[in-house]
Amino acid sequence: MRCLPVFIILLLLIPSAASVAQPKTKDDVALASFYDNAKRTLQRHWAKSLCCPEDAWCC
């Protein structure tokens, strides 16, 4: 009887592990490029704020 909870937990984990191994879909690629664009934009604004915080005209 002690093994029954462990067995049930393992059965619940098996389907979730299989979903991780699935190839990316078109939606996943679009979402990844959206995050890349957002990251690139934030980095550009961060670099501008660091270049000369007092004088914004020099950037």
UniProtKB/Swiss-Prot annotation:
Gene Ontology CC terms, in alphabetical order: extracellular region
Signal peptide: 1-19
Keyword check for 4Fe-4S: no
Annotated compartments: Secreted
Primary site of residence: secreted
UniProt keyword list: Disulfide bond, Secreted, Signal, Toxin
GO MF: toxin activity
InterPro entries, A to Z: T-conotoxin (IPR031565)
Tissue: Expressed by the venom duct.
Protein family according to the UniProt entry: Belongs to the conotoxin T superfamily.
Descriptive protein name: Conotoxin Ts-03
